[in-house]
Amino acid sequence: MKTRYSVLSVAMTAAFYTQYAQADLREQCLLGVPHFQGEEVTGDQTMMPIEIEADNAVINQPKDATYTGDVAIKQGNRSLFADEVRVEQNGEQERRAFLKGSYRYQDNLIQAHGRDAAMDLGSETAELQNTEFQLVGRQGRGTAESGSFNHNKRILKNATFTACLPNDNAWSIEGNEMIQHIDEEYAEIWHARFKVLGMPVFYSPYLQFPIGDRRRSGLLIPNFHRSSKDGFAYSQPFYWNIAPNMDATITPTYYSRRGWQISPEYRYLTKLGEGIVAGEYIGKDRLDEYRPDDNDRKRYLMHWRHNMSFLTGWRLYVDYTKVSDKRYFSDFDSEYGSSTDGYATQQFKLGYYQPNYNLSISGKKFQTFDELDVGPYRVLPQIDFNYYNDELVKGGDFKLFAQTARFENDSKLMPKAWRFHVEPTLNFPLANRYGSLNFETKLYATHYLQEKGSSKQADDMDKNVTRIIPQVKVDLQTVLEADKQLFKGFNQTFEPRVQYVYRPYKDQSNIGSGLNQSVSFGYDSALLQSDYFSLFNDRRYSGLDRISSANLITAGGTNRFFNEKTGVEVFNFSIGQTYYLSPSKIDDLSQNSTTKRSSSWALESNWKFHRKWNWHGAYQYDTRLNQTSLANTSLQYKPSQDKLVQLSYRFASKDYINQNLRSNTYGQDIKQVGAVVGWELTDRVAFMASHYHDIALKKPVESQLSVNYNTCCWSANVYVARKLTATPIGSPDTINDLYYDNKFGVNFELRFGTNYSSGVRKMLKKGMIPYTEQYGIN
């Protein structure tokens, strides 16, 4: 059954809400808790003088004294109020106070009241009976039949605890014994019963929970959802605070149609660096449509991200993600990847950095999710060297880049290769108040040692290939300020830029194999996506295996408007085009060369016409195809961090996709509209709704609706979603055959006075197409 979610209907419900209060939720919650009055005293409380006030006193010096009628005792931060107090003293060290009837006790950390108590004035301990307590300056209250308090620990018998405000019994924890560790800011409870609205719903022989800002180990709140593909799913995360600099979360999840999944995540910050190690594992996926004829039904994900700086100038970076199969991110939601990425990256880089040079060794591999006969190359090792010297030539800046790389492919049809590259550059910059002129010369010198693929059907290769290509570039930029205001109140500048690049032609068809042109040319080159800023790039292709000839002039300019009072930029508009004095090509094939004398027109603009409104637009017109090739625009209203509305449109022509991907299974234009609303309706209620629709297919891509309800001590999130998913095995897979996964879920969160967020930011991160901001003016 197809489910539709109306963003408009959700937004209209906001009209029925009024502002809950002027103060935010945190301020409202803290209004309901007591705060310490007066100046907080530091030091040993037992050594401070004792002040006693009472209506009546019977003193039997030096042994005891009895005080009655509005008795008040103060020592340091501690205050005690009672109907009757008897103080006994045995020498200078032992002083005890016994309270009869009702009492109130308070210090800088806790307030308590009840009947009958005893307090040792020389050791900061107190014995309380039938007490009710409330933490000072933060949420947290409870009761106990008896309690023993000292300077760093509270031991409570038959106790209860809740972070809810007075008169709110949404949830509570009861136990036979509770120990509150004051310095460590956590509580332990034995034979714990968790209650919701007074009804017991969960039992644990032992439980820990925070009573401060420090993180503590223990069970986190479970969440569940239902999916048309997975069935019912239940997750129970466990948090392990291993040390101040490392922790872990272990989350077992049960899918009614798939089985059990275990997801550990370990985070660390040590002298050896900081990072995260995570995994997701299902021993046997029971879903019938997944590999029905394959006994290997394991599904897993491995992720490691690491950053390290050590010794002097050394850095290590690791980003490794591997999944069991191409469909993994289509079947499972994971924060370590998405099906829209198209691939998972496995890479590392070890580098040594100095002010005028750096040296690094790295490796990279891509795990693609598309069905490709030949995948991308893996690179190991890749050694890069960069050297900078602005004194080698008078008036010139010298730069040298050198690289050695080894390429291998999983396909036996594909060649292997070593690539040796040297790239010296000499730049002569001239600049004054009128603008800048850069004259640059560069030389690309590359040598390949190629090995034919091991398959008999592999193409023959030139074993040794040497390519030397010189380059000359002249770049002129200036900033012109208008004498008169075109629009009142706004100053205007125009920034023209002209660039000339020359590179001679070199046939590079003998570098690599043409079998993998669906993903790259040669070993690691691909046609770069074009926009206004890319017009001024030196090259059309990434990597080093394809360097097209160039005899071209690129001209463009940016018009900017600034508020004359604040100097803040409010509008810009850029337009540019490349003019080919001769065709740009990489080999003798006509499809790999330019046939027109000019490139696409590229336009880009940003407009912040109000502090709450942003608009962005980009447009490209392909003069070769005589059609619009790319276009996108978005409009956003954002009055605050937790309130925004964004409308967007994206377009890519079929011919442009064919030109860049070469294996375009989509077969038609991409025309996609989207709308995202994230809104804090009140301090307690927030929602997020999003919808993306493909106009060309006339079908939805993804729809989401999520509502968050927040209180001082708990929050709940309810969401529904419908998104495109991978084609089930054995099902038709044409352009009109789309398959969806429908989800419904509920998440709860207990709040112990440390989190008051509306949940809008978190909700916006959900989904196959996450919310992004692409505005050039903030």
UniProtKB/Swiss-Prot annotation:
Protein name: LPS-assembly protein LptD
InterPro entries associated with the record: LipoPS_assembly_LptD, LptD, LptD_C, OstA-like_N
UniProt-listed PANTHER family: LPS-ASSEMBLY PROTEIN, LPS-ASSEMBLY PROTEIN LPTD
Database matches in Gene3D superfamilies: Lipopolysaccharide (LPS) transport protein A like domain (2.60.450.10)
Signal sequence annotation: 1-23
UniProt keyword terms in alphabetical order: Cell outer membrane, Membrane, Signal
Main location, first listed in the record: membrane
Subcellular location: Cell outer membrane
Family: Belongs to the LptD family.
One example of a Gene Ontology biological process annotation: Gram-negative-bacterium-type cell outer membrane assembly
